[in-house]
Amino acid sequence: MALPSLHEFPWLTTVIAYPVLAALFIPLIPAPAGDPSTRAYAQKLAERIRWFALFIAVTDLLILLAGFYVGYDPGQTGLQLLERYTWVPQVGLSWSVGADGLSMPLILLTAFITTLAILAAWPVTLKPRLFYFLMLAMYGGQIGVFAVQDMLLFFLMWELELIPVYLLLSIWGGANRLYAATKFILYTALSSLFILVAGLAMAFYGDPISFDMTDLAHKTYPLTFQLLMYGAFLIAYGVKLPIFPLHTWLPDAHGEATAPVHMLLAGILLKMGGYALMRMNAGMLPDAHLYFAPVLIVLGVVNIIFAALTSFAQRNLKRKIACSSISHMGFVLIGIGSLTEIGMSGAMLQMISHGLIGASLFFLVGATYDRTHTLELEEMGGVGLKMPKIFSMFTACSLASLALPGMSGFVAEIMVFIGMATTDAYSLPFRLVVVFLAAVGVILTPIYLLSMLRQIFFGPENKELTEHEELVDAEPREVFIIACLLIPIIGIGLYPKLVTSLYDQSTNALVALLRQELPQTGETVAQAPALYNN
């Protein structure tokens, strides 16, 4: 019997299933000898488990890179690495996975960030079996969200990812972890019902009855139906992005999470909302998107300004960075709503860029907290001389967050600005107002970020803190993690085509789909209702 070729190998199924199945073996890892009640025993047990988890994460990343090299062509617009297997034929559920330019960059980002998050979790000794089981299960679930091509399967993956986050927050979080975890699960679980209801409605509308995303995208829906489905999806994905006013779970979750969970929340979780808006709202419901596009832009501007202003008022370091994340995701909304190739490309690049920058900042917040045991900015100060490496890394990552030229955030935001300024889908006054307000948000960002750096590292010295023996500089593991994140941040900033070439064909095809009517009529989006009165 001939072995399947590398092109026929189930790469994506393997990448999704491998960490989940490997996690099931964690309870079988033998415990070390000694007294289970001692700290030394807990450290030895955690060390065995963390090395196993890191090995699984690294090998899964290598498998993904091999599949990317063998079977993915960035020049194509359609789905690649496609696999379809009948799973539950009674309800029309199939195991269908594939990747294109909208999903492959985010799949790669997920594998990369999760591997670093597991390395960042090195100090965790509380219930290590459960902790690393959840981390690996979340690894597979998050890749599944970006890879699956079946609506029911997408919903299952979306829900699978929620449970590990809830447990990681509620068990390993801070003092208010139960409140934050409960708020997270209520927001996300309730909003997920909109995905299920809208997905079922689209599947059972017309013929054929199908949950396959390709079939759903090719169905013809009346405008009213599209608008209802679009609104339902927008609520669900707006919680995850997050969009104001559905954002309030995020500062609480970040305020209580540990460093590795921070990295997953900021680096991957928020991107699920942006990806779904592109894939389902814009890709499956293009007519409705013309109506909602200006709404997305307005919401994006509100995100940028409101979150930037809120960040000024925050005195908690984690919450301040969380608010900056909300602000940065506003550019994703503007890019998606711009209806231009460069704007849509900028939105995708902003998701990738923020994934790297957000993960780096929150990791450094965790590293700083491990040494200072406080998150209140008033209690910090003068620690820069004692921690020069952490100060240098924090400064570099903060400069990336404020979109310094030469770093990825600058390129992404400039692309969104150009897309919004040059689009012919909106009137000139609307474009000018949006660009001006977004620019105000960009100006506010360095003010609160640089002020934060000054307060932490060079503010009035807290001698009780600076003279504490635990206040030590970064260790090699921490320097390695930040270096792994800064290299692509700077690399993308200097040569963005390194990443944009992975998805430009897909984002351009999506924009072409959305603009089919506009070039023919010369109408702006504000006049879009006339397009559907024929």
UniProtKB/Swiss-Prot annotation:
One cellular component term from this protein's GO annotations in UniProt: plasma membrane-derived thylakoid membrane
Topology with respect to the bilayer: Multi-pass membrane protein
Compartmental location: Cellular thylakoid membrane
GO molecular function list: NADH dehydrogenase (ubiquinone) activity; ubiquinone binding
Documented EC number(s): 7.1.1.-
Keywords: Membrane, NAD, NADP, Plastoquinone, Quinone, Thylakoid, Translocase, Transmembrane, Transmembrane helix
InterPro entries (alphabetical): NADH_Q_OxRdtase_chain4, NADH_Q_OxRdtase_chainM/4, NADH_UbQ_OxRdtase, ND/Mrp_TM
GO BP term (any one): electron transport coupled proton transport
A Pfam family per the record: Proton_antipo_M
Root EC class: translocase
Transmembrane spans: 9-29, 51-71, 106-126, 130-150, 152-172, 184-204, 227-247, 258-278, 290-310, 326-346, 347-367, 399-419, 432-452, 479-499
Chemical reaction(s) catalysed: a plastoquinone + NADH + (n+1) H(+)(in) = a plastoquinol + NAD(+) + n H(+)(out); a plastoquinone + NADPH + (n+1) H(+)(in) = a plastoquinol + NADP(+) + n H(+)(out)
NCBIfam families named in the record: NDH_I_M, PRK02546.1, PRK12561.1
Protein name per UniProt: NAD(P)H-quinone oxidoreductase chain 4 2
Origin species: Synechococcus sp. (strain JA-2-3B'a(2-13))
Taxonomic lineage from the root: Bacteria, Bacillati, Cyanobacteriota, Cyanophyceae, Synechococcales
Gene this protein is translated from: ndhD2
